[in-house]
Structures are given as C-alpha cells and as structure tokens.
C-alpha cells in the first residue's frame, strides 16, 4: 500500500490533510492516513494535541464501531465549540447503536431519551447549554427543500446536505427516513377518511331516494355515526414536520 511521506509533514500539514479527508467524507482513506502517522514520542505528542487530528480519530473510531475508543477521545480532550455539534452527534449515535444492539430492536423516541439521560454529553464537547434535540428552522427548511426534490438521496447527496446543515450523514438519513414514514402514514389516514366521507355521502343519497327521513341524534350503526361526524367537520391532513427527538 502506498503511503505518503508523513515523517516530513508538520502537525499543521497533517491537520490539513485530516480536515480535507473529513470534508470529503472518505472515512476509509482517512483511517489509512491516520494509521500511517509516525509513532515517535515527539510527533505523537504534537498530534495528540491537535483538534483536527483528534476529531478525525473520533470519526474513524465511530465508523469502525470502536465506540470505546470514541468515548475515550471525546471524554479526555477539550474541543472547541466549532467541533461540538459533530462530536455530540457521534457520541449520541454511538450510544443509540449500542443500546439497539443490546435490546435487539430499533429505539423509539422514549428509548433515545432514556439513553441520553443515562449517558449525558461530556463537558469536553458541551458548553453546558441545554440541547433541544430539534433542528433549527434553517436546517428544516433545507431538508424540506431537498426532500421535495428527492425523497431518497444517495450517500453523496447525504454528505453534501450534511455539510450544508452542520448535521452528520446519519442524521440526514434518519430525517429523510422519518419524513417518508410520516408522509406514508398521513396518506393512509387521508385515504381512510376519504372512504368514510364517500360512504357517508352514498348512504345519504340512498336515504333521500327512498324517502326515508333521518332521525336526528340517532345513528343506525357505528359506521353511520362515524360518517356523520366526518361529514360535519372539516378535515385537514398535514404531515407532521416536527424534528424533535425526545
């Protein structure tokens, strides 16, 4: 395997390469680059203090499923606020995945809330402000725009959107998945209510044709009662657009 002459690189140059590979989303290449770094004590000491290198190591550890290493990096190094959002996402997602593996099923909102309470963000990647777990309006606007163009973005588009919103590709993918599920549920509910309205209208027409008067306040069947309620109220079907993860 070809290796770059890392020994001639300064810590700043190494950090620059890490940042470039991180932005490209090529985690595999980033991992190979990190493995090729020197092991000399002097060089390691300098690199271990560089935030870009530490952030790159955390990303590689997460994608490799090495969550113990990820937690060690995040808990033992103080990161600047610019890195907080991405590293917080890695911390939470890693704990979610461990909990899912342990329970043998996907986590629901309540499960995720309990995981967050059990494993709070370390102060090394958190400034103490309470996180709402809701996407900002600008982020939601961008996600909705992209969703209307393509509800099934490929990995490249997910990375592009992640960079534009400050989220991780995993968060972007989860948002699109949840939005598709909400839209399908709303469409199914809409079809059901339209069927109820249609059945209610048909019965009313038949009753009028037969000359049978309707008795106010008396429903001949549960279905008739349901259709009556549906016919006398305006129906508005909208898919939930909440991005809260509670």
Swiss-Prot record:
Give the linked disease.
Answer: Optic disk anomalies with retinal and/or macular dystrophy: An ocular disorder characterized by optic nerve dysplasia, optic disk anomalies, chorioretinal dystrophy and macular atrophy. Some patients have microphthalmia.
Provide the GO MF annotations for this entry. DNA-binding transcription factor activity, RNA polymerase II-specific; RNA polymerase II cis-regulatory region sequence-specific DNA binding; sequence-specific double-stranded DNA binding
Give residue spans, biased composition: Polar residues.
191-201
Q: Which species?
A: Homo sapiens
Relate the assembly described in the record: Interacts with TLE4 and TLE5.
Organism ancestry: Eukaryota, Metazoa, Chordata, Craniata, Vertebrata
Q: Does the keyword DNA-binding apply?
A: yes
Name of the protein in question? Homeobox protein SIX6
Q: Name one GO cellular component term.
A: transcription regulator complex
């Amino acid at each position: 395997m070809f290796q770059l002459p890392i020994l001639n690189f300064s810590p700043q140059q190494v950090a620059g390469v890490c940042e470039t590979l991180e932005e490209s989303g090529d985690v595999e290449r980033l991992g190979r680059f990190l493995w090729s770094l020197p092991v000399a004590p002097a060089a390691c000491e300098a690199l271990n203090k560089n935030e870009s290198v530490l952030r790159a190591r955390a990303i590689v550890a997460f994608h490799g499923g090495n969550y113990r290493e990820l937690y060690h990096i995040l808990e033992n190094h103080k990161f600047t606020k610019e890195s907080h959002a991405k590293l917080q996402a890695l911390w939470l997602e890693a704990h979610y995945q461990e909990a899912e593996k342990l329970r043998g099923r996907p986590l629901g909102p309540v499960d995720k809330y309990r995981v967050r309470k059990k494993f709070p963000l370390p102060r090394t990647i958190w400034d103490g402000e309470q996180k709402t777990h809701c996407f900002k309006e600008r982020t939601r606007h961008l996600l909705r725009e992209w969703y209307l163009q393509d509800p099934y973005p490929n990995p490249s588009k997910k990375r592009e959107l992640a960079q534009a919103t400050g989220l991780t590709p995993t968060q972007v993918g989860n948002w699109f998945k949840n939005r598709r599920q909400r839209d399908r549920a709303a469409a199914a509910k809409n079809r059901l209510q339209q069927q109820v309205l249609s059945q209610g209208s048909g019965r009313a027409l038949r009753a009028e044709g037969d000359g049978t008067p309707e008795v106010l306040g008396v429903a001949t069947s549960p279905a008739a009662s349901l259709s009556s309620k549906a016919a006398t109220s305006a129906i508005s079907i909208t898919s939930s657009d909440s991005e809260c993860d509670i």
